[in-house]
From Swiss-Prot:
CDD domains: ATP-synt_F1_beta_C (cd18110), ATP-synt_F1_beta_N (cd18115), F1-ATPase_beta_CD (cd01133). It is found in: Cell membrane. NCBIfam families: atpD. Its main location: membrane. It comes from the Bacteria. Belongs to the ATPase alpha/beta chains family. This is ATP synthase subunit beta. Keywords: ATP synthesis, ATP-binding, Cell membrane, CF(1), Hydrogen ion transport, Ion transport, Membrane, Nucleotide-binding, Translocase, Transport.
Amino acid sequence: MKGKIVAIIGPVVDVSFMDELPNINDALEVRLSETETRTLEVASHLGNHMVRTISLEATDGLARGMEVIGTLSPIKVPVGKKVLGRMLNVLGKPMDGLDEVDTKRYMPIHKLPPDFHDLGGETEILETGIKVIDLIAPYIKGGKIGLFGGAGVGKTVLIQEMIHNVAKNHGGISVFTGVGERVREGHELYHEMKDSGVLDKTALVFGQMNEPPGARLRVALTGLTLAEYFRDGEKQNVLLFIDNIYRYIQAGSEISALLGRMPSAVGYQPTLATEMGKLQERITSTRYGSITSIQAVYVPADDYTDPAPATVFSHLDATTALSRKLTEDGIYPAIDPLGSTSRALTPSVVGQEHYDTAREVQRMLQRYHELLDIIAILGMDELSDDDKLVVHRARRIQNFLSQNMHVAERFTGQTGSFVPIRETIRGFKEILQGKHDDLPEEAFLLVGTIDDAIAKAKKL
């Protein structure tokens, strides 16, 4: 199947075919030289034997009249164990300066979600080692988790910490998909993983900020295809990290405008919910294995009612909200214990003791926030003895929700900590019972277990 380029407008390329037309989402190739090709993806049929395509690479070097070859299938990317430890682009080509991935297995990036009868149903908790997450908004194996936050509140650091903890403590395979984020962060992540020894359990796929919108839109599907093969072909439990899902929506919005579709609310594409559904419905557990996905969600201007974060919300099992106020107070990870939620925080899943401890922590923090206005106007002395005790313990709880990160060791000089869930529950239970009312507040800041806080208090 051969055609000719008839128009190029930025990343949009119109191609005419003399006989049959390629299918929607099929890949087309343009040869620039013996070694160089450009890949296009069919977006719509225009009539008169013409198709409109989106280029997945820069359109430099393309010209009208060039020959286009139909591949008769969607983009296919390499899958399997050979992609572990590698850094790939949207087309599955290496970005790490090494040779092509040596595998015979290739899979198309466009496919249907698993059949209903193939889905897995049991609910099991994924231990992250991060106290505030494990206590307040526990993650489900095979669930979808959103990290919500504005610019610079620590979404990427939290994702890197999660990759580190899962690789070190669960031995699982991770697929990291960088969608429209900074090239520098991808470079740092690659070298950090190499240094910490978790790279050989991870596949990295990047379509960064400098790439055309076609690459940024499709790179999430490339990462997902790699994860699906590990789940179904290798029968593994996989972690899929997407940083940032908002950039996926943003790329879809750019392409929608380039294709001349009428925008909907706030300039987003009219197909926003459909595009998100196609991606999210493929991220699930089957009877063969599970994909647990952790997605960073940039919230434009910290506005949670924006259509992009609002659309993502409807697909999630747990939400981890990052708070700018907590970063200003020096509490890291800056996760808001009152704004974060999880479907798993029920007695039937986590057990009665865990549930009661988490709810009591939230109740005390909620009361503390209500009292802050009174304290600001009248001072601590005007509070009742009960309320003074709430403030006293809530401050210790708020500090104890922080901890040092392994991936931030070289910045902070402090050793990172992985805290098992049972230790997390014990620590918060003891604070709630008043066993550590005599320790100073600072002793609870950026420590791991309650024993670390007691040891720190002795040094103060």
